[in-house]
């Protein structure tokens, strides 16, 4: 529902010192293996290169959900940036090389969690955990947070740096239905909630068990498209230019 920015002293904000002039030659890298995030981008006319991050999320222990997803999103984007840089010699044939040419590319990292009754939840570990989670969630109001980190990597004399690093968090309130044990068990048996931070997929069968939401619906799916448009504008990229690639 609301948009949170990490405190200035905690967020690395480097002002853009170079401009992306030819978006048709600019690769957009998604530092996530999420099919839902990839699908959202493609539906909006952005065809991303998927290069998931290998960042170890257990390194980050924070209790504020907006700060947690922001830090994780940024670290995932940075890890992917470093990985691409290390492999750049092998990436020319598939187009990644453009990331580190004189035309900078874009790397998007994301992370989502559900906050419910003061607790923060990621993906459930197994079916038993998912069933227990849903028994807590039913009839309750949760807050789904997604962190977004947009990096513009640039190389200068062999040194890699982000010439812009934008980090934002978005929150959407989710009103869960009062559903039966039988419905919970049947839903978990589909396997769908096991792959979702909120233990449900708004774009799938989970939509049956959500009464309403307050805020950005794509944020619940894993990526706030309106927020992404705003972040791209901050680095002087008009999202519609991707349609011409």
Task: Locate predicted features.
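Cofactor-binding loop segments of dinucleotide-utilizing enzymes, especially the Rossmann-like FAD-
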Residues: 33, 53, 153
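Short, Lys/Arg-enriched N-terminal segments with co-localized hydrophobic residues
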Residues: 13-24
């Amino acid at each position: 529902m609301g948009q949170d920015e990490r405190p200035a002293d905690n967020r690395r904000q480097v002002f853009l010192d170079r401009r992306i002039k030819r978006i048709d030659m600019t690769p957009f890298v998604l530092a996530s293996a999420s099919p839902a995030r990839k699908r959202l981008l493609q539906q909006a006319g952005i065809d991303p290169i998927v290069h998931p991050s290998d960042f170890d999320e257990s390194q980050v222990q924070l209790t504020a959900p907006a700060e947690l997803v922001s830090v994780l999103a940024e670290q995932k984007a940075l890890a992917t940036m470093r990985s691409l840089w290390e492999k750049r010699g092998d990436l020319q044939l598939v187009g990644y090389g453009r990331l580190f040419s004189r035309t900078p590319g874009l790397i998007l990292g994301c992370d989502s969690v559900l906050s419910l009754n003061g607790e923060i939840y990621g993906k459930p570990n197994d079916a038993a955990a998912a069933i227990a989670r849903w028994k807590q969630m039913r009839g309750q109001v949760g807050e789904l947070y997604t962190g977004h980190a947009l990096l513009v990597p640039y190389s200068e004399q062999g040194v890699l740096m982000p010439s812009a690093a934008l980090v934002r968090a978005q929150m959407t309130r989710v009103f869960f239905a009062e559903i039966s044990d039988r419905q919970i068990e049947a839903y978990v048996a589909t396997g769908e909630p096991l792959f979702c931070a909120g233990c449900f997929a708004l774009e799938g069968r989970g939509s049956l068990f959500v009464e309403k939401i307050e805020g950005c619906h794509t944020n619940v799916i894993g990526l706030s498209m309106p927020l992404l448009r705003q972040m791209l504008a901050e680095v002087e990229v008009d999202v519609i230019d991707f349609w011409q690639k």
